[in-house]
Structures are given as structure tokens and as C-alpha cells.
Amino acid sequence: MIKVGLIGYGKAGQAVAEVLKEDPRFELVWVAKRNPWPEDQPLPLGLPVFAMSQGDFGEWLDAHPVDALVDFSDADTIHLYGEEVRKRHLTLVSAVSAYSDESLAYARSLGEQARVLCSPNITLGTNFLILSARMLRGIAPIADGEILEQHFREKPEMSGTARKIAKTLDLDHDRITSLRLGGIVGLHEVIFGFPHQTVRITHESIRREAFGTGAAFALGELSKQPYGFYTFDDLLMTMIREQLTQPETRQQP
């Protein structure tokens, strides 16, 4: 069983905590957030809570050791715990979507002494969408490409996942259409226009628990890898290669 600490306890973090708590492969040991937990509120899932802004993270880990960290906080928090990841060789799955070039380079450096995965969208389906779209783009580069992203109306910025799709497909950001409607958790669609046909690749997160199942998938697969910096694509490609090298199973007549 892998002991896990969860950093970040917003709406997504809360959903992730519920999934990890129920997965028999993991033991969710604690939750960390930037500010102290309100004293008049019950602890999340009965777990201890660490305030990143006020305590010593190394001392916290000494008292509450874990094997892995899952980060659903913000782009700056990695600098508060990164050296402990390096020193203790902790597995890190980060779903932060807006790392600066400096912070992303720092995350890559942690991969020299630990297993580190960074993915702006941690859902399995979205990452399979990106991989599939990249493959089709490589097969048929002449096709027109457009990206549609839909999210809840309170989300102000362009989706980090949409930006990643655009970068992967070598599309300008003006080829991204953003819609903000009601309570949509997240929908991404890549549309390829051919002269006589259209291909649409779509993924929709119905509940935020999809982030939790994606993080659990990443943790399970990352634990099998050597130290290094990984993307979700790396994990998927490893599994696809394994599938392609397996003998084809034929149904007997």
C-alpha cells in the first residue's frame, strides 16, 4: 500500500481525497493546504491537516511519513516542498496547470532523485484525447484543426489543457474556442476538418472525481518507473507499447 499526502484541498482536491480514501492501493495519510484549517470546522475525512505557510514541511514529514505526494494546489507551492521530494525520494504527481518555465524546470530537476509527473489535466480520458489527436495530426497534417473547451462559468482563464493541446498540435491559441456555461466540470473537443469528412475527439469530465481516478492511475503506473520526470503521455505510451507487443489473442472457432 502506498502512503499518500495530498497538497491542495479546493473543490478538485476534495474530490481527489474521496477517491484516494476509497482505493485499496493507497492510504491517504494527511492533507496540506496553504493556510491553517479553521478550528471550528471538522477535519477533512478525519485526517490531520498541515498549513504550508506556517510550519516546517520536513518536520511534518518526519512525524507523518508518506511515499508519495499528490499536488492539486497552485504553481508556487512546489517550491515549499520540492527539496523534501528530492531528499526523501518521494513520488510526486502534480496536477497544477499553470507552472512558469522556472517552476517547470525545477520540477524536472526533482526527477533526478525521484519519480515526478506533471500534467495540467490529470484525467485519463483527456490525456488519451491528447495522445490520439497528436497521432492523427501526424498521420494527416493537412487537416484543419480547432479546439473547443467548455468549463463552469466562474473559471476565468483559458483552460491549461486546451493550451497544451494547441501546443501539442502546433496550433495558435486563436484556434481555441472557450465557453463558460453553468456548472460544466470540463469538456475538451478537438475537431479535424478534412475535405470530405470531419473527425471529432471529445472528452468530458462529468464529476471532479475523474481527477482522483486519474491521479490514482498516475500514482500506480509511476511507481513502476525508475526515477525521472514524466508526463501522462509517457505513461500511456509505455502501456500502449506493451499492448502492441503482446501476442494477438484470437477467438477460437
Task: Kindly give the residue locations of the regions a language model identified.
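Rossmann-like NAD(P)H-binding beta-loop-alpha module
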Residues: 128-142
